[in-house]
């Protein structure tokens, strides 16, 4: 309910009262409830909302995930039945509670994208991401993170056309265009050229050498080192 976000829950406590995974809808219903039994008493005697489990189960509606394009048909067999959320802190901020609320209700009917993924660290969801060039998609496919600079799986058949044909880079390749500090900073912060390298690396892993070389050359053409 709106009042839960407007007037309450700037911070919500998380306990491990239940030591098994609890389904995410049950968690949100528990927080949503105004029943005093769903509250924790603070030192000053006031009652506060809380989450009674640190392990939360997010069921995967596989047919919805396929129909909405979250997962490609070729990756059907890679999907897990349940995504397990592991809350690593003893409290969550309001924006983090909103993420749980969204996950509880989206039922895999539409993709969830983000550009900054580190908010997911507190949920243990970094291993359920797909890198699509300049954004990350939440997917029900487990891909353990080995390198903090290479978060998420890559579907090269999807990401390469995005980098090659969909994204626009303006006139950055024109030497007459002045790339000022802010342009260089933003492109560096977004690891803009690294996206080409990551997708090319996946193409190489699949032994698609010519495509990988072409993509790397394109990255240098669109964003030459003389500019960025």
PLM regions and their residue ranges:
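ER/secretory pathway lumenal C-terminal domains and tails of membrane proteins involved
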Residues: 1-228
């Amino acid at each position: 309910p709106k009042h839960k976000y407007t007037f309450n829950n700037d911070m919500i406590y998380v306990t491990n009262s239940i030591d098994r995974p609890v389904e995410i809808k049950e968690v949100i219903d528990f927080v949503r409830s105004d029943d005093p039994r769903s509250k924790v008493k603070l030192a000053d005697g006031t009652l506060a909302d809380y989450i009674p489990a640190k392990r939360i189960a997010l069921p995967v509606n596989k047919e919805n995930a396929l129909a909405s394009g979250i997962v490609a048909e070729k990756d059907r067999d890679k999907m897990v039945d349940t995504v397990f959320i592991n809350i690593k802190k003893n409290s969550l901020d309001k924006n983090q509670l909103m993420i749980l609320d969204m996950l509880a209700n989206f039922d895999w009917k539409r993709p969830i994208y983000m550009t900054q993924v580190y908010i997911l660290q507190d949920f243990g969801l970094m291993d359920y991401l797909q890198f699509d060039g300049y954004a990350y998609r939440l997917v029900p496919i487990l891909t353990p993170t080995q390198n903090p600079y290479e978060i998420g799986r890559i579907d090269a058949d999807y990401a390469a056309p995005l980098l090659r044909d969909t994204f626009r880079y303006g006139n950055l390749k024109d030497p007459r265009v002045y790339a000022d500090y802010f342009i260089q900073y933003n492109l560096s912060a977004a690891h803009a050229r690294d996206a080409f390298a990551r997708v090319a690396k996946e193409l190489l892993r699949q032994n698609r050498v010519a495509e990988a070389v072409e993509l790397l050359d394109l990255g240098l053409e669109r964003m030459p080192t003389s500019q960025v």
